[in-house]
Amino acid sequence: MDTKAFKRSLHSSNQYHRKGFGHEAEVTEMLRFEYQSSLIQQIRENGNRFQRGEVTIQLAEAFGFCWGVERAVALAYETRQHFPTERIWITNEIIHNPSVNQNLREMQVEFIPVDEQGQKDFSVVAGEDVVILPAFGASVQEMQLLNDKGCKIMDTTCPWVSKVWNSVEKHKKGSYTSIIHGKYQHEETIATSSYAATYLIVLDLKEAEYVCNYILNGGDREEFLHKFRHAYSPDFDPDRDLVRVGIANQTTMLKGETEQIGKLFERTLMRKYGPDQINQHFLSFNTICDATQERQDAMFKLVEYPLDLMVVIGGFNSSNTTHLQEISIEREIPSYHIDSADRIGPGNRVEHKPLHRPLEIKENWLPEGPIVVGITSGASTPDKVVSDVLEKIFALKSTSPALIP
């Protein structure tokens, strides 16, 4: 499929929307009421440090809702305002935050059902319905299906994600295989790969090293295909399709690792084909999201403070939140990833998600005496959720009445 031509055609359709409908003032007030917090604003104005009783909070300099997330949520709210009686669907979670997605459900925005095989069932969508595409985007195939049905489409895809798609289009135009640094099952990576002619998804530097070793030294083709069996394009052949490669990434991956992977492939292809031929075999574009980078940079600064523990707040399926937790764990700071204040209590206990493990309960997680707690949150986490977590921590450590944010 000529994905570029399809996008041009879709974007010119009267049924397709990627801007608001004129309800900005009303929606802004709704979002302020539901997601902002005066306590968090107070802490920001105090240099991101705040003390109450025995608890000192050190907030990351950058955390929480990014511009792309705010835009997506606002467009979803505007869509409901503009189509008050129409049936509205969304192809996936608008963002990876349970409270925001629950609010959409309460606004009668329905999620496309998924069958036992994990496939979305679009048969429930009628031509007169409205369909929201989430911040992560949607695959070309999904957009084509919805367009063929004649649905009204509200596209809230983050512009940074669209930037990655444009890079992948350039790979395709130059007959380069797209090496995508990401998680093959993540909605954004699924959408990105749908724009590529040939692609291979690598999760981390270790997988990238395996691929680069294969490029230089060859190897067991069947072993390669089995190892990446969920992560490459149809008919992918490692002996044929790794001669010319371009680098792209899921925008929420660790910036440093994406850069390492890009440099590794560049060095590998330079060794194989020579410095004078590198432009014929390697293509790289900077597709790292500014907001992801800012939050990661802020986390690296935060872990330099003398902290007793770290609380990382965000959806458990949020890639950017997980990477923030990784930074804390690398510094050997006790770290607790929670998705809401409901995970704290009763008493001095917390239900949290350790890295790459299921939820578990930790008793007596807050130490006795004065403590300094580092706080950050993923790009899909509202300030109100962070504020609720802080109030729970203050309540556990102090008998003073909780401040109402």
UniProtKB/Swiss-Prot annotation:
Pathway: Isoprenoid biosynthesis; dimethylallyl diphosphate biosynthesis; dimethylallyl diphosphate from (2E)-4-hydroxy-3-methylbutenyl diphosphate: step 1/1; Isoprenoid biosynthesis; isopentenyl diphosphate biosynthesis via DXP pathway; isopentenyl diphosphate from 1-deoxy-D-xylulose 5-phosphate: step 6/6
Binding site for isopentenyl diphosphate: H96, H186, S318, S319, N320, S380
GO BP annotations, alphabetical order: dimethylallyl diphosphate biosynthetic process; isopentenyl diphosphate biosynthetic process, methylerythritol 4-phosphate pathway; terpenoid biosynthetic process
Top EC category: oxidoreductase
Family from the record: Belongs to the IspH family.
Name of this chain's protein: 4-hydroxy-3-methylbut-2-enyl diphosphate reductase
E.C. numbers: 1.17.7.4
Annotated binding of (2E)-4-hydroxy-3-methylbut-2-enyl diphosphate, by residue: H96, H186, T251, S318, S319, N320, S380
Keyword hit for Amino-acid biosynthesis: no
The entry's keywords: 4Fe-4S, Iron, Iron-sulfur, Isoprene biosynthesis, Metal-binding, Oxidoreductase
Transmembrane spans: none
Source domain of life: Bacteria
Cofactor binding note of this UniProt entry: Binds 1 [4Fe-4S] cluster per subunit.
GO molecular function, one term: metal ion binding
UniProt cross-references to Pfam families, sorted A to Z: LYTB
InterPro entries tied to this protein: LytB/IspH
NCBIfam families linked: ispH_lytB, PRK13371.1
Cofactor(s) recorded in Swiss-Prot or TrEMBL: [4Fe-4S] cluster
Annotated catalytic residues: E188
Signal peptide range in chain numbering: none
Protein purpose: Catalyzes the conversion of 1-hydroxy-2-methyl-2-(E)-butenyl 4-diphosphate (HMBPP) into a mixture of isopentenyl diphosphate (IPP) and dimethylallyl diphosphate (DMAPP). Acts in the terminal step of the DOXP/MEP pathway for isoprenoid precursor biosynthesis.
Binding site for [4Fe-4S] cluster: C66, C158, C289
The reaction(s) this protein catalyses: isopentenyl diphosphate + 2 oxidized [2Fe-2S]-[ferredoxin] + H2O = (2E)-4-hydroxy-3-methylbut-2-enyl diphosphate + 2 reduced [2Fe-2S]-[ferredoxin] + 2 H(+); dimethylallyl diphosphate + 2 oxidized [2Fe-2S]-[ferredoxin] + H2O = (2E)-4-hydroxy-3-methylbut-2-enyl diphosphate + 2 reduced [2Fe-2S]-[ferredoxin] + 2 H(+)
Residue numbers binding dimethylallyl diphosphate: H96, H186, S318, S319, N320, S380
